[in-house]
């Protein structure tokens, strides 16, 4: 099982920290999980303009490939202006819908306003629905106050939600792949 964590921003560190913590927890729960972090700020991803994948630059092709071959995902975004980042939306636009179909997604987000947790419900989950992906029932939203001055996640309730999300993603993936849903198709 390949679990890909996606930090869907070009700035800041809190989103990446949240995604990494879910990955680490998933590995703790299930040591055979192959975890990988895709931090969009490490790549020069071109804007999606509808051309063939092979005509994008090397970084863009690599990112598309990493997303396409993963079995399940933890996807993170900061909330800017009440929405997901343009970088994350661009990534979704680059990915073929078939690449994400019937795969499990878990979502994390962070921001400076407590009400922005609704972006997970109102934007990320509908995107997952478009891709016909399975979504973990829980999610993690962390406010700036949940981190200390060193950007370490210190809030115990948020840390518990991180652990719960990791458990849900791992167990949903294994349950779906063990024959439950796919055995009856």
Swiss-Prot record:
GO terms for biological process: anthranilate catabolic process; L-tryptophan catabolic process. It catalyses: FADH2 + NAD(+) = FAD + NADH + 2 H(+); FADH2 + NADP(+) = FAD + NADPH + 2 H(+). GO terms for molecular function: oxidoreductase activity, acting on the CH-NH group of donors, NAD or NADP as acceptor. It comes from the Bacteria. The keyword NADP applies. The keyword NAD applies. Pfam families: FMN_red. It is an enzyme of class 1 (oxidoreductase). Keywords: FAD, Flavoprotein, FMN, NAD, NADP, Oxidoreductase. Its EC number is 1.5.1.45. Involved in the pathway of tryptophan degradation. Reduces FAD/FMN to FADH(2)/FMNH(2), which are subsequently used for the hydroxylation of anthranilate. It can reduce either FAD or flavin mononucleotide (FMN) but prefers FAD. The enzyme has a slight preference for NADPH as acceptor. Anthranilate 3-monooxygenase consists of a reductase component (GTNG_3158) and an oxygenase component HpaH. This is NAD(P)H-dependent FAD/FMN reductase GTNG_3158.
